[in-house]
């Protein structure tokens, strides 16, 4: 029964793949929980510093930092955060589609675009399409630190300081829940004003030793913290997407095994029926 042996070989192969995807699902679930903890730990800082910066942008400062001034958007920079590994569904490609659509709108209005890419998937994608990539970094692992990102962020900040770009955005996947990851584009520069436009009065802070030196450091740290938060959120999204993808692959493998087992049983039944028929026919001929 050559057909039966071939089917059994396929079943064994699919079972082997199912074991791999099941193990990857469990690993991704464990890493996702760890990534969620890191994301939850850093999110309050990122949120609060964003609120502080928003109020500073609305304040009446004697010293106007260049990051607060609106410019005509002739050149736009994107810091794109992706994963280093695949097998995470459409996480990366959905993000790339969103940033390319936004970049196309900017280019349609006459602006130039350039990219700083984080993660090997974004590095490969934007280099292969011939985009202008000003900085790139990959291999950050599952627990990156802020210092890992400082160099790449500094390249884009220097470009902004030199007037080489007029807008700076960070693009990442925002973690909503295990089943939902939302591609997000946040403006970093010029500083976005506070979302609370309905506040009845404006206030300013007291700066020690002076506004100039403090804001120079604070605003750079703000940009770095927002990019870091995007990286941390993206890691949580990556693990959640991988867990869901591997669960789907495991379930599909189970369905395929059931289908192959049914085909095998039918083939075996047909072979037995044929053998019985041959035996009966042979006995009748002898008799």
Swiss-Prot record:
Q: Which UniProt keywords apply?
A: ATP synthesis, Cell inner membrane, Cell membrane, CF(1), Hydrogen ion transport, Ion transport, Membrane, Transport
Q: Name one GO biological process term.
A: proton motive force-driven plasma membrane ATP synthesis
One GO cellular component term: plasma membrane
Instruction: Respond yes or no to whether keyword Lyase is given for this record.
Output: no
Q: Which Pfam families match?
A: ATP-synt
Q: Which InterPro entries match?
A: ATP_synth_F1_ATPase_gsu, ATP_synth_F1_gsu, ATP_synth_F1_gsu_CS
Membrane topology type:
Peripheral membrane protein
Q: How does it assemble?
A: F-type ATPases have 2 components, CF(1) - the catalytic core - and CF(0) - the membrane proton channel. CF(1) has five subunits: alpha(3), beta(3), gamma(1), delta(1), epsilon(1). CF(0) has three main subunits: a, b and c.
Report the function annotation for this chain: Produces ATP from ADP in the presence of a proton gradient across the membrane. The gamma chain is believed to be important in regulating ATPase activity and the flow of protons through the CF(0) complex.
Protein name (Swiss-Prot/TrEMBL): ATP synthase gamma chain
């Amino acid at each position: 029964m050559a057909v039966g042996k071939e089917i059994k070989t396929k079943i064994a192969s699919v079972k082997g793949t199912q074991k791999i995807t099941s193990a990857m699902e469990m690993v991704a679930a464990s890493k996702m929980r760890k990534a969620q903890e890191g994301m939850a730990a850093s999110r309050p800082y990122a949120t609060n510093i964003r609120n502080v910066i928003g109020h500073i942008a609305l304040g009446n400062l004697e010293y106007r930092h260049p990051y607060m001034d609106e410019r005509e958007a002739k050149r736009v920079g994107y810091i794109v955060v992706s994963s280093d590994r695949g097998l995470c569904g459409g996480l990366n490609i959905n993000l790339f589609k969103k940033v390319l659509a936004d970049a196309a709108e900017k280019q349609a209005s006459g602006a130039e675009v350039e990219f700083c890419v984080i993660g090997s998937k974004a590095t490969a994608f934007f280099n292969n399409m011939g985009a202008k990539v000003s900085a790139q970094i990959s291999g950050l692992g599952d627990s990156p630190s802020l210092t890992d990102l400082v160099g790449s962020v500094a390249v884009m900040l220097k470009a902004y300081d030199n007037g080489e770009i007029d807008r700076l955005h960070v693009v990442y996947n925002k973690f909503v829940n295990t089943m939902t990851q939302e591609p997000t584009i946040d403006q970093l520069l010029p500083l976005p004003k506070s979302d609370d436009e309905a506040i009845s009065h404006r206030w300013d802070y007291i700066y020690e030793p002076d506004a100039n030196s403090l804001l120079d450091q604070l605003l750079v740290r703000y940009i770095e913290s927002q990019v870091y938060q995007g990286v941390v959120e993206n890691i949580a999204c990556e693990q959640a997407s991988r867990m869901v993808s591997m669960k789907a692959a495991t379930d599909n493998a189970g369905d395929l095994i059931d289908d192959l087992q049914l085909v095998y049983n039918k083939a075996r039944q047909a072979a037995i029926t044929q053998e019985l028929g041959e035996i009966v026919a042979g006995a009748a001929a002898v008799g």
